[in-house]
């Protein structure tokens, strides 16, 4: 028998990476929040790679931290190995990545949710949802009925989940958990635009059966940069990763058994991730390649499980064993968990606003893989924004909408709600037009003032941030006013780095503009240098060295924002606008962009269509001014 379980401000369905950030943000902003999960023991689970960060994903984690989210802190507290990727390239693409103790990370996040004021964490499966009299009504499997002002759907791969391993398939969530089958039916009945996507995960092997002496070890960085700008946790490297490669025998085994793959036999209907293909997909698509790189990574400090990055598969279990045993170092490996593919329901993100609220469902928000994205970091970023905006809607405040020039978070959301996605969306640095401005090292300078204004950044943390800004400006002035004097030692170093020697004296800032010079190189010749934190000098050096490029990108941002401020009425009838092409009418009517800048980024909307739209808006503005 159904019973009334009470009223809440914000209900979050799912306690994965999106649900955690949504629940914490909502509660920290003062809303009575309830987070529902199918299993309390799997809060913040990592069903695939036990890592946080990576190229562009590390940018997202630092942005989450800069806004006041939790992922960066949780990762720092549970890191096994930390590396900064792409150090051989420019600072725009430097990206932190950490190997994580997945069980410890989960326990950290569960404890954080349990201890958060205004938040209740509950093990319960939501099986029905509908809108009634200005509230969302949620019913659990045990017939408890909750009423919520706003709901965040953060269902991950649980929604209608089905696992595939060769000829075997069955209803399941990730890691053998129950799927959310009834909720999927309820959302379809509600009218949400659901579709099927697919993802997969590799096998896990017992470390004791891996011949590590045959593998190439990979160590963490000596100079560690944590995810969190707070520096709350001391991050240490305690485990190694390893590298190996597939070979010709691996390829033969997979190709001879391709007919047994559900991916190639037509059993899987869902669309898989373009940038994270299975090993059988890689063998077929890149047939000319002789080998594929495999990373063997620890899953935790208290387990022998090792994760095989690059070997995602849905081939039968016996075939998996056969091809694993062809790989150097894995010839005698024991599989602890079999690789699988999982198909699940998600939405078309074109149904969402930039606030991540549905266009047609008041107070209903989506986040994470439910929105068609892939990855823990993409999920957490969306969860943070959805949680913030659900809370702000309850409090009758305007939504937080980050634009493309503010953050990778803004780029991610804009891509999803403006362009949509035909396969699981993955963040990449190449997706941003402004990546020199959106570096991982300056995420706090871009976003911490916003987090403070929202109420997610403490006064103590904000004061420390403001002090950092003061030091950056002080050092810039010093660099402009400090003269570095010529000497044989300095000129020998400059010549060895293939840059011209100096005569007499030169300003420190002028030397720093040279690609071959940096603060570390110039330390012996800069006796007045103050004892500031290294991140202060890092920011000053980048600002000086890339000043011209930064100014050019900022001019592009100013032009983009000129169009972003031109709002489009949501009740506009595009079909009534003379001059718009039919494709533009269809796309604009479906997506309903909130401003001209967003409209200009829609595939199928031309510059000529934007001109027609601008003329119409200007005409309407003149009418209102009279």
Regions found by a protein language model. Name each.
Residues 4-18:
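Beta1/beta-strand and adjacent pyrophosphate-binding region of the FAD-binding site
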Residues 6, 24-131, 142, 154-174, ...:
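Conserved N-terminal/central alpha/beta ligand/cofactor-binding core
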Residues 141-150:
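Core beta-strand elements of the Rossmann-like FAD/NAD(P) dinucleotide-binding domain
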Residues 150, 155-159, 315, 328:
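Glycine-/small-residue-rich beta->alpha transition segments that form the dinucleotide
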Residues 307-373, 401-414, 533-587, 592:
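A glycine-rich dinucleotide-binding beta-alpha-beta segment and adjacent secondary-structure elements
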Residues 379-400:
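Internal hydrophobic alpha-helix adjacent to the cofactor/substrate pocket in enzyme cavities
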Residues 431, 437, 448-453, 457-611, ...:
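Extended, charge-enriched "interface" segments that sit outside catalytic cores
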């Amino acid at each position: 028998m159904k019973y009334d379980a009470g009223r809440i401000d914000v209900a979050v369905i799912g306690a994965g990476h999106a649900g955690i950030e949504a629940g914490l943000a909502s509660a920290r902003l003062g809303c009575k929040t309830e987070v529902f999960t199918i299993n309390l023991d799997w809060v913040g689970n990592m069903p695939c790679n036990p890592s946080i960060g990576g190229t562009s994903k590390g940018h997202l984690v630092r942005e989450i931290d800069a806004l006041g989210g939790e992922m960066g802190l949780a990762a720092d507290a549970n890191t096994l190995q930390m590396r900064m990727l792409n150090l051989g390239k420019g600072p725009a693409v430097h990206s932190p990545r950490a190997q994580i103790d997945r069980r410890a990370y989960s326990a950290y996040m569960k404890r954080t949710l349990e201890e958060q004021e205004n938040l209740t964490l509950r093990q319960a499966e939501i099986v029905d949802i509908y809108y009634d009299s200005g509230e969302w009504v949620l019913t659990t499997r045990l017939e408890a009925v909750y009423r919520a002002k706003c709901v965040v759907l953060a269902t991950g791969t649980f929604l209608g989940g089905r696992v595939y391993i060769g000829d075997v398939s069955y209803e399941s969530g990730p890691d053998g958990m129950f799927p959310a089958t009834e909720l999927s039916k309820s959302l379809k009945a509600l009218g949400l635009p659901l579709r099927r996507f697919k993802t997969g995960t590799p096998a896990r092997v017992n470390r004791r059966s891996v011949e590590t002496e045959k593998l190439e070890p990979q160590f963490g960085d000596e100079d560690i940069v944590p995810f969190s700008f707070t520096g709350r946790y001391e991050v240490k490297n305690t485990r190694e990763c390893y590298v190996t490669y597939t070979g010709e025998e691996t390829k033969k085994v997979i190709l001879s058994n391709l007919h047994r793959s559900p991916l190639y036999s037509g059993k899987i209907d869902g669309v898989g991730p373009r940038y994270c293909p299975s090993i059988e997909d890689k063998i077929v698509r890149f047939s000319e390649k002789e080998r594929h790189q495999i990373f063997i990574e620890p899953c935790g400090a208290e387990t022998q499980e090792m994760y095989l990055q690059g070997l995602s598969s849905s081939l039968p279990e016996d075939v998996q064993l056969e091809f694993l045993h062809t790989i150097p170092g894995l010839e005698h490996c024991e599989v602890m968990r079999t690789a699988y593919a999982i198909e699940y329901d998600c939405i078309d993100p074109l149904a969402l606003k930039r606030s991540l609220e549905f266009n047609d469902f008041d107070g209903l928000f989506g986040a994470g893989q439910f929105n068609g994205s892939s990855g823990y970091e993409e999920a957490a970023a969306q969860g943070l924004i959805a949680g913030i905006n659900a809370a702000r809607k309850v409090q009758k405040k305007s939504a937080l909408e980050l634009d493309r020039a503010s953050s990778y978070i803004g780029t991610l959301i804009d891509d999803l709600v403006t362009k949509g996605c035909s396969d699981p969306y993955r963040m990449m640095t190449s997706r941003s037009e402004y990546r020199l401005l959106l570096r991982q090292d300056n995420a706090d300078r871009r976003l911490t003032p916003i987090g403070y204004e929202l109420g997610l950044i403490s006064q103590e943390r904000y004061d420390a941030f403001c002090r950092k800004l003061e030091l950056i400006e002080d050092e810039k002035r010093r660099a402009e006013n400090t003269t570095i004097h010529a000497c044989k030692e300095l000129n020998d170093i400059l010549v060895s780095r293939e840059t011209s020697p100096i005569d007499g004296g030169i300003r420190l800032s002028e030397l720093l503009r040279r690609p071959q010079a940096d603060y570390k190189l110039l330390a012996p010749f800069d006796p007045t240098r103050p004892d500031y934190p290294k991140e202060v000098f890092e920011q000053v050096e980048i600002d000086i060295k890339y000043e011209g490029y930064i100014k050019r990108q900022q001019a592009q941002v100013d032009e983009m924002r000129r169009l972003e401020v031109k709002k489009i009425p949501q009740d506009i009838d595009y079909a009534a606008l003379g001059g718009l092409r039919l494709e533009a009418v269809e796309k604009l009517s479906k997506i309903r962009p909130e401003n001209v800048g967003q409209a200009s980024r829609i595939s199928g909307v031309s510059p000529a269509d934007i001109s027609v739209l601008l003329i119409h808006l200007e005409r309407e503005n003149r009418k209102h001014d009279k």
